[in-house]
Amino acid sequence: MNISEWIEQSRSVFKAQLDTKIKIIGIIGKDYPDHGKGDNINCYLRENVFPVATSDNETCTIFAHFSEDEQLLFLVLNGVDDVANLRKCMESESKNYFEAMAESESQQMRLLHFLFISCHFIVIFEQTSRIDLEFIRFLKKVNTLRSLNRRKVSQRLRDVDFDFDSDGRLTVPYVLMAFQRNNIRTDTNITKKRELYEKLEKNLDHQLTDILKLYDLTGSGNSALCQLSESLQVVHLLNPDSVKRDIITEMFDIFMAEAENGNVARVAANHKLTSNNAFVRFLEDRFRAEKNEISLNIAIDMLEALQFVLDGSLEEKPESLRSQTQTFIKRIQSDHMEEARRLYTNETRPVSGERRGGGFRITEQETMDPSVKIRSKQEHLIRFNEATCYIETVVGINQQEILSQVQTQCNDMWQSDLRACESISMMGHPCVKKVHPTYGDQTVPEARWTAHDASNTLVSTCVCGNKQLVRQEPFTLKEANFDFYEHPDFNCCKGLWRYQFQLYQEDTEEKDDIMWADRESNSLRAAKKMAQREDELAVELDDMELPESLQQSYTSSEDSSEDDDDFAIQTASSEDSLSGSDSYARPGSRRDEFESSKTARDMAVYFAKRIQKLEKLEKMDDFLMGVPNTLTIGKLPMFPSFFLTSLGESNLYKHGAGLKNQPNFKLGGEYLTPAVVFLDVDLDVWCRDLVKFRTDDYTRRGTKDLKDDMPRVKLFVGFEYECSRGHRFFVDHNGEPLIYPRNVNVLKESSARASLGNILNADLPLRRPCTCRKPPLKSAQLQKIHVVTPKAPVKITIDPKILVPGHEGTYGTGQEPLELHHSKYYILHLPVVYSGPSGTWMPGEYNSERMGTLKGGSIKVVYKPVMPFRW
C-alpha cells in the first residue's frame, strides 16, 4: 500500500511487532510490461506482495510492505520512467507532456530524497545490461538537495527517540545493484556460464564503484549520498531461469530432512525455507552483514516525521521561488556565456568543481598557457562566429542582449589579451607574438620596442661562403639583405676586402655616424687604388714567411700548366691566407669598433631613429629603401643589398680539387665552371702585351711559351644557389645543378660540359627547385656569383641584371659595372629579398617552376692594352 496509508495503519496492524528490530530496504527500478521491479522481491519474500505493473493512479509514489518473517520493511519507488507514468504524462489534458514530465521528475527527486535518508539498504534494479549514467546524474542532484535541506530534516527528527546521523538521516545507506539482462549466450553450458557471470559481476562492481566516486556519491564524511560494502560484492546478475522457485519441492526436501532427524515438530513450528536462489542468497548475505538497530515503532515515528519531505513542505514559498527562478535564469545565462567563452578561447571543459565564475576576463597565467593561443583577426572572427552560433542555438530569452554582451566581451578580450601582431615577414609568414610596439613606434618609450618573430628559421651562408648560421625570418629589407651578414660570428669575412657601394648620406651626417658606409671608399676609383696598394704590398710578401697553406698554393700554381689554369683555393681560413698583409682588410675606423660592440637591437634602434630624423626633415623621397632598380635611377639606397668581396689571389682555387671549407655543397658539386673568352685583338699585339704583362709581373716565378693560336683567356665562374635549409649548388648554362660523378676527371669533364654552352651569356633562373629530396620540398635562390679572374691584360666587369616576376624595371647594383682586378677570387653576393617600386617579392618556399631571370652577359671581358707604367 501507499506509504502514507501504511504509516496510518501500521501501529494497529503490527501492534505485536512494534519493539522488533528491523531493517528498512529501498527498492528502485523500472516497470516493463512483462516484468516489474517488485517481481524479484516477491521471489525473495515467497509471496506476491508487489504488483507486476503499476496503475496510473499509483505513479510517483512509494509502496510499503513489512515482512514479519524477514523483519524487513520494503519501500518500493514507482518512478518517472515506469510505463504507467509515461502513459499518464502522454494522456494528460491539463498539461503538455514536457510539463507533466517535469512535475514527475520533481516528485521523484523528493521520493529519492526520502529513501536515501530513511533506509539502511537501497537496491537498484537495472533492466538493461549497463549502468544508467543519466540516473547517476539524477542521484547527484538528489545529493545536492539532501545537503541543502539536512538542517531542516535534523530539526524534524529531534522529537524521534533515536540517535540519528548528524547529517539528518537514519544512516548512510548501502547500495546494491542487480541487472535484469546480460549479454551471455543462452546456449553456453552451465559451468562456463557461471564463470562468465562471476567475471561480468566483478567488472560491473568495479565500474559502479568508479562511477559513484566520480560523481562524488560515495566517500567519507557528510557529503556522501551512499556507501558500498568493502568486503562483499554489490553487483549481481539476475539469471531469469533461476528466479522462479519450486516452493513445494523446497518444503518437501526440508520436511524429509528434519523428519529423518526426528525434529518434525520443530519444522512445523519454524517452517522458514532456506533459499537456493542465487539472487535471494545475494540479498540475504548482504542484509545479515548489518545488525538491526531501529525498532518498528521508532521507524514508524521517523517515517511519519519525514512525510514533509514527500509533500513538498521543504520547498520555498512562492515569493522565494520567484527569486530562485530569476537566479536560476541568470545562472543558466552565465553558464551559456561561460560555454561561449570556452568556444572562443578553445579551452577544454572544466572538471567538476572547477567552473569559472561566469566572466570573460582571462588572467595573466591563462595568457601564458599554450592552450589559450593568440590569434589573428581572421581566427578571431571564426571563433567569435562559433560562440555566437552557440548562443543563437541555446538562448531563447533576451537573445539579442546576450549576443551583444558576447560580441563586446569577445572583442575586448581579443584586443587586450589575444590579438596577434600579424605583421608579415619578408618570407610571407605572420608574426606570432601578441600585438606589440616595434622599432620606430613613437607612441611608446624606446625600451618597449621589440622585434617581430615569425616562429620560423632558415639557414643562410655568410658573404664569403665559409660559414652558415641559423637566422630568424626577417621582417625588414635591411634585416634580410644587410644586418644578418654583419653578424659578429662571421669572423671569416672581417679580414677580407669588400667593395663599398655608394649609399645615401645627408649633408648633416658625418662619415663615422653611418655604421655601414665609408664615403671615401664608395667609388670604383677607390677599388682601383686598393688594387694598386695590393700590388705594392705584394713585393713585401716575397721577403716574408708565408703560411704553409699559401706556400702550397704558390707551389701548385707553378707546377700546373697554363692550359689547365688550375687555381687552388685554400682550405685554411681567410685569416691564414691574409697573414702578413692587410691588403684586403677594410680600414679600421670608429665605425668598426662601434659595429662590433652593438647588438642587432642596437642597430635596429639606430636605424629607426635615423628614419625618424629624416622623416622630420621631410627627406623620405631623397633616398631608396629597397633594392636599386632601373625605375629608381638617381636615388641612393640607405644600406647595401649587394656585397662584392675578394677572397684573395686567384691561385686560391684549384680546379682539380674544387672548393674547400665551403659547407653544405653536395659531393661532386663544389666545382666552378671554366669559361673561355675570345678577345677582339690582333694576335701579335696580344702576345706582345701578354709577354710584357707577365714579365713585369713581380709575382711571376717563371715564364712559359705562348702557344695560343688566337687571343683568349679562361675564367672560372660559378652561379651558386641556396635554399632555406642551407643547401648549396652551382648550375650549368641550362640552369641545371652541376654535380660531377665520383672518380671522374673533373678537368676533362668540365671542359666538355663548358663546350656545350656559354654560361656567361646564358639567362639563368633566379629561383628553381632545390636538389634536396626530403619533404617538404624547397626552392633555391641565386645567391652568389663566383668569379676567378685570369692573369692577363684584360678588363673584367660584373653588372648583374635581374628580372623579378610581376615587378617592373630591372634590379641591379645601381652603379656602373664593377671592375674586377686581375688574378683575384671574387664573390658577388646577391640580395635575399627583392623589393622595389612594385612591392616586395614573396615567391613562397617551393615552386616546381623556375622563377625570375638573371640576364646573360653580366660578366664581360675585354682586352686592355698594357701601358708603359704599371697597371
Curated annotation (Swiss-Prot):
This is Nonsense-mediated mRNA decay factor SMG8. InterPro entries: SMG8-like. The keyword Mitochondrion does not apply. The gene is smg-8. It holds the Pfam family Smg8_Smg9. It comes from the Eukaryota. Involved in nonsense-mediated decay (NMD) of mRNAs containing premature stop codons. Probable component of kinase complex containing smg-1 and recruited to stalled ribosomes. GO terms for biological process: nuclear-transcribed mRNA catabolic process, nonsense-mediated decay. Keywords: Nonsense-mediated mRNA decay. Belongs to the SMG8 family. Residues 541-596 are annotated as: Disordered. It comes from Caenorhabditis briggsae. Residues 573-583 have a biased composition (Low complexity).
